[in-house]
């Protein structure tokens, strides 16, 4: 079986994917799942509210559930992806809610380095198994999923307090409401007061809350989301740039040019030429 862009559901809900992309850009988002990304070739930049990682071949990152993150690859990559939903994590270990996962891509700690290597080896075994024609492939994939989950809990998880759990879940519910509102209305002229109203907060309090919990301002998040939609249409359609900008609510052309150059290190016209 060909490896290219294989996607499999494991044990019902977990998702494995072998992916080859020429370039990609996904704005700030989160999953109701723990996510592992293992770069086999190429590069990928991962940004969270706390840090920015430039991943290259052989590096692997673990992103905890509900952690806002963005990914961008300017030159493409080949990667293995595994997403384990929190519901499934809870089935394996009921105390999931009271634990968090700590994974340092650039660690020099020998114990953590060895543990990361073991996880990477299991992911490579998943790749080999997923591309096989064995009638027992699904059994082996489920077995590897359990082994990886065990390693994640045993080597990378630590307990959190009840107070931290309460604050985290309350903030997650609030952010979910804001993100849902933004995705539904981003084409419109959204004011800070509009977004703040979704949480019944004063705009100043809302700005502090959003920045503290995402690492970016709300307006930056909104425009990054618009930029991702513009980028998607730019590389998949022949529509004129001004039509795409109007479609996705990007009315400030100067800001768009600045953000596009900062994010992609090129111009919209050059990007389209490179894709032809």
Which residues make up each language-model segment?
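Generic protein-terminus/edge-of-domain signal
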Residues: 1-60, 67, 73-75, 94-102, ...
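Short, Lys/Arg-enriched, Trp-marked, Pro/Gly-tolerant hinge/linker segments that flank
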Residues: 104-117, 130-141, 150-180, 184, ...
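Basic/polar phosphate-binding segments, predominantly the helix-turn-helix DNA-binding elements
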Residues: 183, 189-227, 239, 245-274
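A hydrophobic/aromatic-rich effector-binding and dimerization subdomain
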Residues: 1-20, 65-132, 149-161
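Generic structural signal for alpha-helix termini and adjacent loop/cap motifs
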Residues: 42, 129-132, 155, 185, ...
């Amino acid at each position: 079986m060909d490896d290219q862009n294989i996607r499999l559901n494991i044990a019902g809900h977990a998702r494995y994917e072998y992916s080859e992309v020429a370039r990609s850009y996904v704005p700030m988002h989160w999953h109701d799942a723990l996510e592992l990304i293992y770069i086999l070739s190429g590069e990928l930049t991962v940004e969270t509210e706390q840090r920015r990682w430039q991943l290259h071949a052989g590096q692997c990152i673990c992103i905890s559930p509900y952690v806002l993150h963005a990914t961008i690859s300017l030159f493409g990559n080949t990667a293995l992806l595994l997403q384990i939903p929190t519901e499934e994590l809870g089935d394996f270990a009921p105390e999931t809610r009271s634990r968090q996962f700590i994974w340092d891509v650039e660690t020099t700690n020998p114990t953590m380095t060895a543990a990361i290597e073991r996880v990477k080896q299991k992911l490579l075994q998943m790749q080999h198994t997923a591309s096989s024609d064995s009638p027992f492939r699904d059994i082996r994939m489920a077995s590897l999923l359990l082994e990886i989950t065990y390693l994640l809990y045993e080597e990378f998880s630590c307990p959190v307090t009840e107070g931290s759990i309460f604050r985290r879940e309350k903030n997650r519910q609030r952010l979910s409401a804001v993100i849902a509102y933004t995705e539904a209305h981003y084409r419109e002229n959204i004011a800070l007061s509009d977004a703040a109203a979704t949480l019944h907060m004063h705009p100043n309090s809302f700005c502090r809350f959003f920045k503290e919990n995402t690492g970016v301002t709300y307006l930056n998040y909104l425009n990054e989301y618009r930029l991702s939609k513009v980028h998607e249409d730019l590389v998949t359609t022949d529509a004129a740039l001004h039509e795409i900008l109007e479609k996705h609510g990007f009315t400030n052309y100067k800001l768009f040019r600045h953000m596009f150059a900062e994010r992609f290190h090129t111009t919209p016209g050059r990007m389209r030429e490179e894709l032809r």
